């Protein structure tokens, strides 16, 4: 499992993201356990020259956080345009589409996927995990809002205990989970 340090996360400089964001800038200042942006930035620094998929970006703040390590490439997906694609950062590519329809993904380069999709009902998340299993992809999945409602709690509780880590104290107040997906 991933070792995390709350003080280290709290000390991360998030000014680069705050300066580029067009909405919700104050959330980058939030301490771990309230917002997950510092956790995302920290995790992006744990590997280099990989691809990170940000699924459900809305206003782009998750992609900005995940882009902290400039050696990685972030591909950010949203079904509808909500303004994020106006943000310019050299290691972020914005796509207005369902990531499952993107034939350009080089799956062997993808190390981390953030799933933060509406509605948070556990069904969409399950569909996406099934899709990734069909692709035979393995890596780290970050799941947002795992304690938001009964449906998400049920979804989270059905995942294998030995493959998951509840990191809510470092992430978002409504629940953040890490899933080691298809890892042996």
Briefly describe each language-model feature range.
Residues 1-114, 118-184:
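A short alpha-helical cap/connector motif
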């Amino acid at each position: 499992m991933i070792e995390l340090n709350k003080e280290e996360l709290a000390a991360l400089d998030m000014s680069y993201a705050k300066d580029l964001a067009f909405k919700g800038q104050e959330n980058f200042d939030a301490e771990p356990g309230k917002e997950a942006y510092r956790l995302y930035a920290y995790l992006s620094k744990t590997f280099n020259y990989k691809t990170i998929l940000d699924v459900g970006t809305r206003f782009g703040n998750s992609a900005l956080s995940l882009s902290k390590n400039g050696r990685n490439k972030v591909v950010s997906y949203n079904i509808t345009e909500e303004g994020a694609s106006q943000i310019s950062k050299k290691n972020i590519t914005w796509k207005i589409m369902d990531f499952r329809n993107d034939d350009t993904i080089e799956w062997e380069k993808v190390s981390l996927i953030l799933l933060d999709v509406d509605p948070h009902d556990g069904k969409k998340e399950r569909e996406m995990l099934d899709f990734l299993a069909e692709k035979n992809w393995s890596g780290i999945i970050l799941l947002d809002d795992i304690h938001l409602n009964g449906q998400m709690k049920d979804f989270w509780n059905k995942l294998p205990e030995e493959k998951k880590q509840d990191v809510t104290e470092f992430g978002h107040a409504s629940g953040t989970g890490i899933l080691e997906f298809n890892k042996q």
